[in-house]
C-alpha cells in the first residue's frame, strides 16, 4: 500500500502516516474504501441504476415519465431538481397514512426530522429499513481510518456524551425523530457486539434516557469513574461537548459526593439508569478527592486532560457553524487535537474524513459513492446556485477549487433533492473528490442543530417590535450574532430604537425582556426545543445600542471599501472589529425572562 500523507490527486491507498502495520481486522475495510474511491463513476452509475430500478413503480418517478428507465440520460432529461417544498405534499400523504408506493417501493419505516422549513416546522425525511445498513457500513469505516493515525485505541474506552431527543407520531402512525435518536434506539446500536474500538464508558441505558439531566449525570459519573481508561472524548457537535464541561462545572460537588460514597444521587430516578450505573459506581474516596481538588481551583484551563489524563483527541464536529467553538475547546482541553470523522445528515450519510487528525481548518470529507447518487450545482461568485438541472455536475467531474450545492438521490426516494449544503472541492483521493464544508445555504444564526435564516429573524423582530408601539418606539435597525462566550451559547440581537411622537415614553426593561421572549416564541420549533427540552441554547438577549450606531457601522464598512450605493446592513455579524464596535455602543442589555413554549406534540394533518 502506498503512503497517503496529504490530500491526493493520484491513485493512492490509505496507510498510516508512520508507515506502521495495518491491523488485520482493518485491511478489508481500508480495501473497500480504496475500491469505492477508485471506481467512483462506475459505482455511481450502478447506484443510480439500483435506485431507479427498485423505485420504478413509484408515483413520483411515474409522473416524471421515466417509464422504467434506469440510465443516466433519461434520469437527467426527465427528473427535475427539487427542494423540500416541492416534495412536501408527497411526504405529507405518507405521514397521513398513505401506504402506496409514492416515493419508494420499499415501505417507509419512519421519518427522520431535519432542521426547519420556512414555516418553522421540522422537515420530515422518509427512510426505509435497509438505510440503517448503509449508515452502519459508514460507521464501520471510521475506526479503521482512525487507527492509521492514533494507535492503541483498542486498549481503552471512549467517553462520548450521546443523547436521544423527543419523538412524535405522524397522523398515519409513523415515528418522526432525529436521525441519531433513530440510530441509538435501533437494534444495530442497542445489540451491537462487543468491539474494543467502540467500547464506551456510558451505559446504553444512560444514552437512551430521555431526561437530559439524568442522562448527562449518569454519563458524566461513569466517565469519571473510568477516567484512566478514557482515550478519547466526544459528542456529536462541539457545542455538546462544551455543554458537558459546563455540566461538570455546575455539578462537580455532587458528582464527587456520589463517587466517594458509591451511591448515585436520588435526582437520577430512572430505574434502568440507576441499575446500569450501579455496576460502575463504586466507593472511591481518592477519586472524589482528586475531582474536588481539580474542580475547586476555579481554573478550568486544560480540565479535560487534568481529569482524563490519557485522552488522545476530541471526537467532535467543528466544521461549519461549530467552528466558533474551537477556541473554547482548545482552552478546556489544553490544545488536544480535534477529529472530525464523518459527514452526514438526516437525508443521507455521505462520507468520511480520511485525514481525521488534520487541523480543523483543513477538514475535507470524501463522499463514498455507494451511499447514494450525488450531483452538484455550481455556486456562482455571489454565493448563489441556480436550480437549472442542466448545470448539474456528476461526483467524478467536479473541479478543484469550485464551490457546489449538494444534490442527492437516495434509496429512500428523494430524487435530485437540494440538501442546502455548500461544499468546496479541495482535492481527490484516488478518483473521489474531497470536499470542505463551507456553509448551510441561507442560514444566518446557529448555536447547535438550530438554523435560523434571515427571513425568520426578520419575522421575529417584527413580532417583538409590536410590543414597543405603546411606548411610541420602533426598531430602526438591527443585526445579530451567535454568542458562544458562555455555555450554552445564545442569540444576541442588536437593536437601535427610535422614539417619536408626543406620547413617546422610555421603553422599560420589563418590556424589552418581553420582546426577547416574543422573539423566541416566533423562532422555529428546533430552536425552541433546544431552549426548553435540551438546554443547549441560552436565553435570547437584546442589546440596545445608542442612536447612530448603525450609521457608524456603515461608515466603517465604507472605510474598508464597501460601496455606499450597495451597502446593506448585515443581519448577522462575526467580524471581531464590528462586534466590538456594536458592543461599545450598547446602552442596555436584556434577556428573555422565561422559556418559550414547546411541546413534542403529535403532528397534525
From Swiss-Prot:
GO molecular function: acid-amino acid ligase activity; AMP binding; indole-3-acetic acid amido synthetase activity
Keyword terms, alphabetized: Ligase, Plant defense
Tissue expression per record: Expressed in the inner floral organs (lodicules, stamens and carpels) and at lower levels in lemmas and paleas.
EC number: 6.3.2.-
Binding, AMP: 115, 342-346, 365, 421, 440
Induction / repression: Induced by auxin.
Domain of life: Eukaryota
Keyword Transmembrane helix among UniProt keywords: no
UniProt xrefs under Pfam families: GH3, GH3_C, GH3_M
Enzyme class: ligase
Gene Ontology BP annotations: auxin biosynthetic process; defense response; intracellular auxin homeostasis; pollen development; regulation of defense response to bacterium
Mutant lacking the gene: phenotype: Slight increase in disease susceptibility to Xanthomonas oryzae pv oryzae.
Family annotation (InterPro entries): GH3, GH3_C, GH3_M
Cellular compartments per GO CC: cytoplasm
Other facts noted in the record for this chain: Plants overexpressing GH3-8 exhibit enhanced disease resistance to Xanthomonas oryzae pv oryzae. Plants overexpressing GH3-8 exhibit abnormal morphology and dwarf phenotype. Plants silencing GH3-8 produce mostly non-viable pollen grains.
Family: Belongs to the IAA-amido conjugating enzyme family.
Job of this protein: Catalyzes the synthesis of indole-3-acetic acid (IAA)-amino acid conjugates, providing a mechanism for the plant to cope with the presence of excessive free auxin. Produces more IAA-Asp levels than IAA-Ala levels in vitro. May participate in the activation of disease resistance by preventing the accumulation of free IAA, which reduces the expression of a group of auxin-responsive genes encoding expansins that control cell wall loosening and expansion. Contributes to late events in stamen and carpel differentiation, and influences floret fertility.
Name this protein carries in UniProt: Indole-3-acetic acid-amido synthetase GH3.8
Top-level taxonomy: Eukaryota, Viridiplantae, Streptophyta, Embryophyta, Tracheophyta
Gene designation per UniProt: GH3.8
